[in-house]
C-alpha cells in the first residue's frame, strides 16, 4: 500500500457522505450484493448433488456459513484494499474510506466472521465444506488481493477461483465429497468471471488506472479486451454443456437459450468496438449476472422436478 493513503486512513476527518448506522457500515464491509450472487450458485449445486430437494436445515446452515465466509473474505479485502478504494470513484464510499469503521475493527470483524463460518459449516454440514470455505477465504485474501490484483492483468482470471468455491462447498455439504459435476460448475463460474469483471473494468478503466491496478482494460486496447471476453464467453457456454449427462432436457433448454443470449451480447460488444462504434460494456456486465443466475436456477429446477438425467 502507498504511504499517503495509509496515513490518511489513520486520520478521522468528517466524511463527505451521510454516515450509515454502525450495523449498516459493518454490513457494507461484507459486500452483500456480491454475497447474493455467490449464494445463488450454492443452493442449485446442493439440489444437483441431492438430485432433488436437500434438507432445509442443511441448506440454511450452508447458506449461513457460506454468507459469513464470503463476508469475511470481502471485509478483509476492504482492509487490504483501503488505499485503492480511497482513489477510485466506484469504491470511495466504502466504510473504511469514509471512516465509518476503524481499520483494526474491520480486520477483527473479518477474522471473527471467518472463524464463525468455519465452525458453522463444520458442525452443521461437514468438515470438508468448512475446509473448502476456509481455503476460499485464504485464497481470496492472500493470493488474489495481496498478490495477483496489483501485479498482473490476469488477476481476475486466477483470482476468480475463490468465487467459484461456493458451488463446490454446496456439493460437499450434501455429499461429503467433491465429484465431477461440482468441478464442472466450478469451471462454469471460473470461465464466466473474466467476461463479467472485464466488462465492468472497461466501464471503470480510468478508476483502475488511477489506482494502479493493472486490470486487462487498463493495459490492453478495447478490441483486445472484447476479443478475450468473447473467447471466455464461448468457453463458458461450452462448459455449461458438460453438465448434460447429469441433467435432463429442462437444464439443457435453459443452458442453450441463455447461453445464446449471452454470446449474442458478447459478440455485439466486440463488433461495436471492432467497427469503431459507440459501445456500452455494462450491458454485458448486467446480462452476465442474469445469465449466471438463470443458469443455476435451471440446475435447481431440473433437479427438483426429478426427470431422468441423460445418463442415469
UniProtKB/Swiss-Prot annotation:
The listed locations are: Cell membrane
An example GO CC term for this entry is: plasma membrane
UniProt keyword terms in alphabetical order: Cell membrane, Heme biosynthesis, Membrane, Transferase, Transmembrane, Transmembrane helix
Task: Please tell me where this protein is predominantly located.
Answer: membrane
EC number of this enzyme? 2.5.1.141
Which CDD domains did the record assign? PT_UbiA_Cox10
Its record classes its membrane topology as:
Multi-pass membrane protein
Q: Highest taxon of the source?
A: Bacteria
Which InterPro entries does its entry note?
Protohaem_IX_farnesylTrfase, UbiA_prenyltransferase, UbiA_prenylTrfase_CS, UbiA_sf
The reaction(s) annotated as catalysed by this protein in its Swiss-Prot or TrEMBL entry are:
heme b + (2E,6E)-farnesyl diphosphate + H2O = Fe(II)-heme o + diphosphate
Gene3D superfamilies assigned: UbiA prenyltransferase
Membrane-spanning residues: 21-41, 53-73, 105-125, 127-147, 156-176, 182-202, 225-245, 246-266, 292-312
Q: To which pathway does this protein belong? A: Porphyrin-containing compound metabolism; heme O biosynthesis; heme O from protoheme: step 1/1
Q: Which GO terms describe its biological process?
A: heme O biosynthetic process
The Swiss-Prot or TrEMBL record annotates one GO molecular function as:
protoheme IX farnesyltransferase activity
One Pfam family here: UbiA
- Give any extra note attached to this record: Carbon 2 of the heme B porphyrin ring is defined according to the Fischer nomenclature.
Similarity comment: Belongs to the UbiA prenyltransferase family. Protoheme IX farnesyltransferase subfamily.
Query: What function is annotated for this protein?
Result: Converts heme B (protoheme IX) to heme O by substitution of the vinyl group on carbon 2 of heme B porphyrin ring with a hydroxyethyl farnesyl side group.
Q: What is this protein called?
A: Protoheme IX farnesyltransferase 1
Q: Which organism is it from?
A: Saccharopolyspora erythraea (strain ATCC 11635 / DSM 40517 / JCM 4748 / NBRC 13426 / NCIMB 8594 / NRRL 2338)
- What does the organism's lineage look like at the top? Bacteria, Bacillati, Actinomycetota, Actinomycetes, Pseudonocardiales
Q: Which gene encodes it?
A: ctaB1
Amino acid at each position: 500500500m502507498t504511504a499517503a493513503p495509509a496515513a490518511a486512513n489513520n486520520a478521522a476527518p468528517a466524511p463527505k457522505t451521510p454516515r450509515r448506522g454502525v450495523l449498516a457500515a459493518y454490513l457494507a464491509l461484507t459486500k452483500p450484493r456480491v454475497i447474493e450472487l455467490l449464494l445463488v450458485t450454492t443452493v442449485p449445486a446442493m439440489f444437483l448433488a441431492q438430485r432433488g430437494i436437500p434438507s432445509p436445515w442443511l441448506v440454511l446452515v450452508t447458506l449461513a456459513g457460506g454468507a459469513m465466509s464470503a463476508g469475511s473474505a470481502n471485509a478483509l479485502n476492504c482492509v487490504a484494499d483501503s488505499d485503492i478504494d480511497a482513489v477510485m470513484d466506484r469504491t470511495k464510499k466504502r466504510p473504511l474510506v469514509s471512516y465509518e469503521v476503524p481499520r483494526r475493527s474491520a480486520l477483527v470483524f473479518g477474522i471473527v466472521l471467518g472463524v464463525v463460518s468455519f465452525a458453522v459449516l463444520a458442525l452443521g454440514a461437514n468438515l470438508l465444506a468448512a475446509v473448502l470455505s476456509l481455503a476460499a477465504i485464504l485464497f481470496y485474501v492472500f493470493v488474489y488481493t495481496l498478490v495477483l490484483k496489483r501485479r498482473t492483468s490476469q488477476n481476475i482470471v486466477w483470482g476468480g477461483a475463490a468465487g467459484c468455491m461456493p458451488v463446490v462447498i454446496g456439493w460437499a455439504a450434501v455429499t461429503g465429497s467433491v465429484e465431477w459435476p461440482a468441478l464442472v460448475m466450478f469451471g462454469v463460474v471460473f470461465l464466466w468471471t473474466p467476461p463479467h469483471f472485464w466488462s465492468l473494468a472497461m466501464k471503470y478503466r480510468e478508476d483502475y488506472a488511477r489506482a494502479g491496478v493493472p486490470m486487462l482494460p487498463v493495459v490492453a486496447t478495447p478490441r483486445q479486451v472484447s476479443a478475450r471476453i468473447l473467447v471466455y464467453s464461448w468457453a463458458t457456454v461450452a462448459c455449461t454443456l458438460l453438465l448434460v449427462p447429469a441433467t435432463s432436457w429442462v437444464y439443457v433448454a435453459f443452458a442453450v437459450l441463455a447461453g445464446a443470449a449471452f454470446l449474442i451480447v458478447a459478440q455485439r460488444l466486440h463488433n461495436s468496438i471492432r467497427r469503431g462504434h459507440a459501445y456500452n460494456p455494462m450491458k454485458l456486465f448486467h446480462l452476465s449476472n442474469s445469465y449466471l443466475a438463470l443458469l443455476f436456477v435451471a440446475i435447481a429446477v431440473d433437479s427438483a422436478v426429478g426427470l431422468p438425467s441423460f445418463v442415469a
